[in-house]
Amino acid sequence: MRRDDGYDILNNNKLVANDIMPVVTLEVRMIFFKVILIAIWALGVPYLMGLLFREKCLKKDNLNAGHAIVTGYFLMFAVFYLLTMPLLLASASLSLLVILFASVCGLTSIISVILCRRRIKNHMRSGFTFFKNSSVIFWIAILIIILQTGVLTVYQHIDDDDAFFVATSTTAVETNTIVEIDPYTGEVLTAHRMRYVMSPFPVYTAVFSRLVMMHPTIVAHTVFPAVFIPLAFLVAYLLISNF
């Protein structure tokens, strides 16, 4: 179909569509790749680290994958804290912290796969059996947890302290520093705020965002709710199951 001036509308639309499709395909691939990264760092690495510690250090071989995941998060946070404190006080770069943290956790996970491969297979089989034999009440609870997680993940929620904590994470990523820039003013801090130095969760958000190649704000408002809400329920379930 042509306009009065001879412009071919149909052919032009085809050309536009052909130009857009590669871009859309690339974006879908990037989203899929980032989802895999999130699964690795939010689930795979904690599980493998916790499994290695429980089986080889604590010699507890009768516990399920949930115990390994929770233990792994304790270990990940401990490793992160021990790495962050000296680097922060030494005014090291965020990139160095990311490299060291990823190296320690990655190496530990690889060792876990090598030494605990039989236990991993057992956990896969026992997990399948557990979910297969779970009651209706259990699946209703899972559905409610998914709904709660989905609301906070998909819809917008505003936290008053985001002006500092998320801004601190974003500033760390953008300036490649560890709590050296005031997120309110953008000026270099003359002294460390010890309250936040001793509890560097905004720095963890920045490191995690680097590892999964996402903006810290998206990590804080979309990724972390999807991770930590189910994790909190998992901790509660493991505690209650002991009684």
Task: Identify the role of each PLM range.
Residues 73-75, 141, 194-195:
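A short, ordered amphipathic alpha-helix with a cationic face
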Residues 130-151:
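Internal/C-terminal transmembrane anchor helices
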